[in-house]
Amino acid sequence: MIPIKIRRHFRHSRARPLIALVTAVTASAALVSPSPSTSATVTEVSLAPAAQTAPSAQPDATSTAAGTAPTKAQMIDGETTLSVDSLAPEIITSGQDLTISGTIANGTGEPLEGLSLTVQMEDSTEMTVTGLESWLAEEQDSAMRRIYQGDLGESITPGEIKTFSVTIPASDLPLGDEEQWGPRGLEVTVSRGRAGLDQDRTLLVWDTGAKAGRSHVTTLIPVTASTSDLTLLTTGAEPPTDADLADLRTRIASLLELAGDGVVLAVDPALLEALGVTRETVAAATPSPSPSPSPSATSEEADDEAAPTPTSPPEPTETSSASPSPTGPAGSAGPSATASPSDSPSDRRPNQALTRALVEAIAAGDVVALPWTDADVAALTHLGETDLLADAYRRTEESQTVAAGAPTSLAWMAGDLDSATLDALPDSAHTVVTAPGDLPVEEDLTYTPSQVTSVGSRTVLTPDANLSDALGGTLVTDESSTDLSGLDATQLLRAETAVMTRQAPALSRSVVIALKRSDAAGVDAKTLAERLKALRESSWTSPQGLGALTAEAAAQQEEGTKVRRADVPDWVVGDEEVSAGELAAARATRDYLSSVTSILPDPQAAIGTASEIVERTASAVWRSDPPGRASMAESARERGTAVTGRLTAVPSRTINLIASEANLPVRIT
């Protein structure tokens, strides 16, 4: 039965950025019951100002100022918008009630009165990822069942945003056939009379506990510089101050804290060096090897178990927290050193905190070192820049990131993989990550196969394009690309892995997800951690590390079970690759900076790390912003220009030359 089917394409409701009201709005908050029109006898709906922080409603007017928590529904001039902001639970089991909460924004010039809410749920589970995404993007419809309809009971004044909450009993949910476990679409519509004003869609995941082979999930996270980070480090008249770098250090440290089961952190050693990770900071953060492998050492090891990171080794030389987060546990001072003045909640050595985060990450999970400045291996190969590429690998091998324990075993392609690039990789790079969607399967399969294969002696990971987009907070279909809300991104990750698991429940497969370099800087680490947790803790998934993927690739070869994929092409040049002209311009800037600073006792104090302009121009992250790459080389000259502008010749006394030649003393300040 489908009593109501409302179809509206309100594209703005899918992209739901968090906004705060600048002007104060007032509203009366009340708890209202649904109208008798709903068959759900114990269903509840509440409507209250979005600014309220407690579930209890106040009858008096309250205001929503700019300093309050941001609301979710987007205020659009002349329109009414609705946003589903939370589900409780997000993964539902049989017999559970469902609570849907959200916000409604009145961007019109008149009060909204006589409003009603309608909630519909899909009758069956989506069977394909493409169908799931098209439905969520409101590009296609499906059979829906109305599970709630009721009046809101209050008006919403112009410029006001109000929250709503609807609780639907388990008996009203179309969740009967346990074989239909997995994602179900939810659609919430706000109407006035017969006119639908706006609607929003999200996903609920039904977990019946059905037996299925878990999907083994591996997620790759780039801990690399963004284009804006490289611009900060390289351009401008003055090098960035430590205050300028504070946010960048915090962001990188927060990414390192994501280390754990099923997560692979791919780190750029050049970025960590630019942020102050040195031999000294690594030595200070590395656990002391003093507990020797003798029976008497067991008690010391037991004491060291109190370190903040459960899977990391003890931290004997530092007692403060690893990042600018709340202070660490008391009494964790190590046996080999006394606390330094910086070991305080206001750690005055941010480079030490960042180094500690690196060391703890290496102990907690898979951390690999990328070539210096995350060099675009394919682009440099296509340009014949063998020396620059070799230098990138050499500098990584000599870096403190590798000294801390990160191997150089992984190469992460920024574009399509080709044979020329494979041949250019060093022997140490025995695992290759392709761009999402590269090397597609060329067999007719009814399920998504493991996203790991092999080419020659190398393990090749082929990340899932849909899941990789969702991890970055984007819904990409054949027709559109839309930013996802936090709820939708998390639910889409759960939903798509559930669909993939259901396709072949008797067959456990490996799922590889890669966060795009361009997305890494734009996703809050806390939000990213929640998405990783959703992938790790679903009953149909389990985390998996690099070692298991390598073993699976070897087993495929030995057993002849490797799925046939497209052959690796000989040569593929991407449109966004760095050009020979851009590298030439970068080299000209480097030479200019070198000539300007050659007379200075400490060039780095004057220009910072701008001398890395060539290496940074070759970074893979610039594929997302080729124009920015082209302008960086010219902008980097500002450092040299600032130096020459401060040079003056100091006046001296007259010198009479009697000989035909002489050495003249010149002092430059």
Q: Which residue ranges define each predicted feature?
A:
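Secretory targeting and sorting signals
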Residues: 1-41
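Proline/serine/threonine-rich low-complexity linkers at boundaries of modular beta-sandwich domains
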Residues: 67-82, 637-646
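Asparagine-centered strand-capping/turn motif at beta-strand->loop junctions
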Residues: 103-109, 667-669
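Short beta-strand and strand-turn-strand segments in soluble, beta-rich domains
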Residues: 126-153, 648
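Catalytic grooves of carbohydrate-active enzymes
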Residues: 243-246, 257, 263, 394-406, ...
